[in-house]
Design a protein with these regions (language model features):
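Conserved structured core elements
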Residues: 11, 15, 26-29, 43-50, ...
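Charge-patterned, long linear interaction tracts outside catalytic cores
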Residues: 3-21, 31, 318-352, 356-358
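A glycine-rich, hydrophobic/aromatic-adjacent loop/helix-cap motif
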Residues: 33, 49-201, 272
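Long, well-ordered, tryptophan-enriched scaffold segments
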Residues: 1-74, 78-79
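Flexible glycine/proline-enriched surface loops and loop-helix/loop-strand junctions
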Residues: 2, 14-18, 28-34, 87-92, ...
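Acidic/polar loop patches that form or flank catalytic/metal-binding clefts of enzymes
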Residues: 44-47, 60-62, 85, 114-124, ...
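Hydrophobic alpha-helical scaffolding
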Residues: 7, 11, 21, 25, ...
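A cross-kingdom feature strongest in bacterial/archaeal respiratory oxidoreductases
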Residues: 102, 111-116, 131-135, 165-298, ...
Length: 492
């Protein structure tokens, strides 16, 4: 049933998500007339666009004569597409209310059935991935000299996965995965220097950074953050951030304040891999990855930072860098690329594994990099026509994705209209569960951890008169300067 109330076996009453959707979004506050002035689009235009989207999606389907089988075993003779494509990333998501705005757009896509169909928005391999049970962040417990039990970044399933102490204070310096930023999936690197300067949530002795130029990038206050690195504690005379180690290829604001600078190479002078484990370059037609090989020999005293990290790990005899007899495992990053395994059979590169014919998974191959070079430094796996669409529920695709190591099991990936993880955070704020937010964050968590998308004015509008300056500017870096900022731009 899509609507109505159901009594569960345990006696509790429950309603389908669509009942909750209708109960919220049919309220007068969501009517076109209620939002027209706010968004600057007349109500009649909003209704016209909505009608056009619905007409195209449901009355003008894009149909491919391609049979496929879903995860329930049902065979479909055609692929029915809803030719409405919606995209949201930088722009909408750059605003402080963008999280829920993007969620609203994704909900619209799900209601239209315009997810990975002919003519609609499509997944790029190795996605989609099931969430949950994506691995949660690790770091609640740790021991010096031993590796973390998993990745420091991950996907919290609820308050139980937050990296907080018993009293609710953050365990990470950047406060990611705390009650202040429970869904900080990429970490909050822009808060690293301000938090280290403030000693909040704790003081640190060393800040060690690579390439980010955090004195300028993402700080929104270059002068203020630069002063933080030079400021001393009047009580002790010591710097508030005692030691800063930084590696970069060029001079920058952060280099100027570093105690130790490790000169890096440019991307033209080192080995790199564009990995399925990091930021993959796959397409809707299949997974892909690539390498960079050095084409210039450095003419100065520099070393690739990846090589430096491997050397440090080896000299410190850290697990994963030395064998049981104390000998080094990797000579350099070049060897690491083909030799390292995240888990048995899975490494940084997916192509030419094992005997050189393996795709996705396979034993490390000493000739892997040579095979990439012979293939113009790229590897790509082409999906079949049957696997090309409905990847979250396409039996053939999910079996292939499992075989390639992109997912753990060939099971349907359920798309959540109602976010269960957000519901758990809201319930905690309402007093349920063992892990509770601090009282000062309880109201905020209850409001914003809404399992259904909401809209609210950008937070900065509360700090100034929005009517006096109603425009919101979003800056965008050119691709060539994506990892080179401010004073570094002169070098490009």
């Amino acid at each position: 049933a899509l609507v109505g109330e159901v009594v569960l076996p345990n006696g509790l009453a429950a309603v389908p998500v669509f009942e909750l959707l209708a109960g919220r979004y049919l309220l007068p506050e969501y009517a076109p007339e209620s939002v027209a002035e706010r968004c600057g689009v007349p109500a009649e235009t909003i209704r016209r666009i909505a009608a056009e989207i619905a007409d195209v999606a449901f009355n003008q389907p894009l149909v491919l004569n391609q049979p496929w089988t879903d995860t329930a075993g049902r065979r479909h003779e055609t692929m029915i597409g809803r030719p409405v494509a919606i995209h949201a990333m930088r722009g909408i998501s750059a605003h402080s209310n963008g999280f829920h705005t993007c969620r609203a757009l994704h909900m619209l896509q799900m209601l239209l059935g315009a997810i990975d169909t002919p003519g609609s928005w499509r997944y790029k391999a190795p996605y989609p991935k099931p969430l949950p049970p994506g691995p949660p962040p690790v770091g609640k417990t740790w021991e010096a000299g031993k590796p973390l039990a998993g990745s420091p970044l991950g996907f919290p399933r609820g308050p139980e996965d937050l990296l907080v102490a018993a009293d609710g204070t953050p365990l990470r310096l950047d406060k990611a995965f705390s009650w202040e930023a429970p869904l900080g999936l990429h970490g909050l690197m822009h808060m690293l220097l301000p938090n280290a300067h403030a000693g909040d949530p704790y003081p640190v002795d060393v800040v060690f950074m690579y390439m980010a130029n955090m004195a300028w990038n993402s700080s929104m206050d270059p002068l203020g953050v630069s002063r933080m690195m030079a400021e001393k504690d009047p009580a002790t005379g010591a710097y508030r951030i005692p030691h800063i180690i930084y590696s970069d290829a060029f001079y920058s604001e952060t280099v100027a304040y570093a105690d130790l600078v490790l000169p890096d190479t440019t991307y033209l002078e080192r080995w790199d891999c564009i990995s399925l484990l990091d930021r993959p370059i796959g397409s809707p037609h299949g997974p892909a990855d690539a390498i960079r090989q050095p084409i210039l020999k450095p003419d100065r005293d520099v070393r690739p930072f990846q090589d430096v990290l491997i050397e440090l790990g080896t000299r410190l005899k850290l697990p994963g860098f030395v064998a049981a007899d104390g000998s080094r495992i990797y000579a350099d990053y070049k060897e690491y690329i083909w030799k390292h395994e995240r888990k048995p059979g899975t490494g940084p590169l997916g192509g030419f594994r094992g005997d050189g014919t393996g795709n996705g998974v396979g034993a490390p191959n000493p000739g892997q990099l040579d095979a990439y070079i012979a293939n113009d430094c790229f590897w790509r796996y082409e999906l079949s026509e049957e696997e090309g669409y409905f990847k979250h529920a396409n039996k053939a695709y999910l079996e292939t994705a499992t075989r390639l190591g992109m997912i753990g099991a060939p099971e349907q990936i359920v798309l959540q209209l109602y976010s269960e993880p957000l519901a758990k955070f809201r319930l905690a704020a309402q007093g349920h569960g063992k892990v509770q937010p601090p009282d000062r964050l309880r109201e905020r968590t209850a409001r914003f951890a809404d399992p259904l998308p909401i809209w609210y004015p950008p937070l900065e509008d509360a700090m100034e008169d929005a009517s006096a300056y109603p425009l919101h500017a979003v800056t965008q870096r050119p691709a060539a300067m994506y990892h080179s900022w401010h004073s570094q731009n002169a070098w490009l």
